[in-house]
Amino acid sequence: MAEQVLQIPGPEGPLQGTLVSGAEPSAPMVLIIPGSGPTNRDGNSPLGIRAAPYRLLAQELAARDIHSVRIDKRGMFGSRAAITDPDQVRMQDYAYDVGAWVEYLADRGSQRCIWLLGHSEGGLVALQTAQHSTRLCGLILVATPGRPLASVLRDQLESNPANQPLMPEALNIISALEQGKTVAEVSAPLEPLFRPQVQGYLISIFQVDPVQLIKNVNGPVLILQGTDDLQVHTEDARALSKAKPDAIVKVLPRVNHVLKEVPEGDTQANLRSYAQRDLPLAQGVVEAIVAVVKP
């Protein structure tokens, strides 16, 4: 299957993505939006994630004659020259860039519209983009929070008993950021999450309410959620579907956050799969997407 690196103009330099083409030029096009932090277009991260879910997904879609473009966010990886300081990026900037990709792809190819597939935090970006883009076929929300990200972050921190000594400080920081206030003093263990340089971005994304955004989406929506996701839960999928009753909801058993099948309830095996690039995507992931994109 053919792969091609694409570039479009960014604010200061190019934004970059990878096109994987199906056989038919007029086949549907899916734009894959990465999740939080330093997640690249393959779905990998220097923080230990090597499962490559986006690359595997692109290959599986192409095998079913669906084109895809998976992108690097501005300031990171192939899009690092798009902005001098990636810490100055706000959530709305990512949505603007996705809108620019949609316009480029819709003008470039034979598709009248583009599907957005957002994974995790990328689902929030997809929802934000859908508020203003008029050239979307629909949304595919994969492991997407159904509540503001501050609530998700609280739950993630509280679920790990090792974090208990840090929780008073962490909860105070989250509350301040929710109110639009920065926090100058952050203890060393919490620096990776809350260092002052990223607080502006966190303030911007904590203001995003996915339930309110999805209510404004007129086109088709697929909500795809695994039961063994350690970061986003089936309750999030239910919250999104309640706000968008005509959405298609697929809950996949034993599927985790990086879209791999894992033994039910086995946290260690679940976490190990994050580094297993040769582990295929879980059965049902691609099938659910194809059923919506190519009904």
Regions found by a protein language model. Name each.
Residues 255-259, 263-295:
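Catalytic active-site module of serine/aspartate enzymes centered on a nucleophile-bearing elbow/loop
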Residues 217, 223-225:
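Short beta-strand/loop motif that positions the catalytic acidic residue
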Residues 140-211:
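Accessory cap/linker subdomain of secreted extracellular hydrolases
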Residues 1-25:
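N-terminal cap/lid segment of alpha/beta-hydrolase-fold proteins
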Residues 52-80:
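Conserved alpha/beta-hydrolase
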Residues 86-107:
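Alpha/beta-hydrolase active-site loop
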Residues 104-159:
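Primarily recognizes the serine-hydrolase "nucleophile elbow" in alpha/beta-hydrolase
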Residues 25-61:
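Short, surface-exposed "cap/lid" segments of acyl-processing enzymes
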